[in-house]
Amino acid sequence: MYIKNLYLDNFRNYDNIEIDFNKKVNILTGNNAQGKTNILESIFYCSLGKSHRTNKDKELIKWDKDEAFIRLNLSRKPLDKKIEIKIFKGGKKGININSIKLKKISELFGIFNVVMFSPEDLKIVKESPGHRRKFLDMEISKLDHRYYYKLVQYNKILDQRNIMLRNKKFLNNDMISVYDEQLSKFGSSLIESRIKYLNKLNEKGKIIHSDITKGKEEIEFTYLTHVKGRENISEELFSLFKDSYKRDVEKGNTSVGPHRDDFSIKINGIDARSFGSQGQQRTSVLTIKFASIQIIKEISSETPVLLLDDVLSELDESRQEYILNSLEGIQTLITCTGIGDIEKYLKNDFNVFRIDNGRIAEY
């Protein structure tokens, strides 16, 4: 699977551009703030129907326009795909696949998988549990529409429970019990799927991390949850909701459940978030991203497109070399301010595009 070409109209700082991509490596070079990341953002948007940088779609529209348009032509077996997205200033969007309008955004998932690696991904290792949950939810949703449905249902019911907890004069124990039962049903399925995904991440990640560090480090991912057992997760989750009820009423929110869970990342048995060096933290993210590629390939039988947004400059030479030597068979788009030493690691089949204030020239 690879992107054949991309057309943008009034997207971010682009008036109207069309780019034909190499099926192997494409390098987008230019000074900062010229629009390199905007191209990757538009491609990411075609995968999940959302930006990796903002929750406000109106920010994607050129400042003096009312709508933006993205068209991405994809070579994909057994049938090529044309993804077209209109983004409106009022907040709505329209998505078509091969000229057929999608009824819901989840229908887009799995059509076109990408793995994005940007400096912000360090948050997966360094910052709060919410970033790690977001990573899990996004990666699993790409591969399983049912997971996304259950996640949406869980969050809707959670919101209803929290509203009732905060409005004590409307507190209804019978209704809380109904919410607890529904949350246990959907929540247990989320936990099971996350644990399965982390098992795969461990399986792939251990080999990748050992390769990157030349056998000096071992990485391990462990799911962290209030649920102790693994046999009757739904029943245990229901008990946890019941046991936390008084505390939840006092605080006005739900204190247990998959929306509070986390996963640890350990390097040689030491927590990478608290005690890992910056180099170890960067390597952990690199491991996670390349393991994600392998998981997508294993489950979907298709290789995702890899988007590297200004990350090579953040890595030392050995890690740069690992990435650039691992691109065989993966269409890759790389943004950077200059080619520098990248070229010596790449085979001849790559394209270079110069980005200058929303204008693109191939050379």
Curated annotation (Swiss-Prot):
This is DNA replication and repair protein RecF. Belongs to the RecF family. It holds the Pfam family SMC_N. GO terms for cellular component: cytoplasm. Its main location: cytoplasm. GO terms for molecular function: ATP binding; single-stranded DNA binding. PANTHER family: DNA REPLICATION AND REPAIR PROTEIN RECF. The keyword Metal-binding does not apply. InterPro entries: DNA-binding_RecF, DNA-binding_RecF_CS, P-loop_NTPase, RecF/RecN/SMC_N, RecF_2. The keyword DNA-binding applies. It comes from Clostridium acetobutylicum (strain ATCC 824 / DSM 792 / JCM 1419 / IAM 19013 / LMG 5710 / NBRC 13948 / NRRL B-527 / VKM B-1787 / 2291 / W). Keywords: ATP-binding, Cytoplasm, DNA damage, DNA repair, DNA replication, DNA-binding, Nucleotide-binding, SOS response. One of its GO terms (biological process) is DNA synthesis involved in DNA repair. It comes from the Bacteria. The RecF protein is involved in DNA metabolism; it is required for DNA replication and normal SOS inducibility. RecF binds preferentially to single-stranded, linear DNA. It also seems to bind ATP. It is found in: Cytoplasm. ATP binds at G30, N31, N32, A33, Q34, G35, K36, T37.
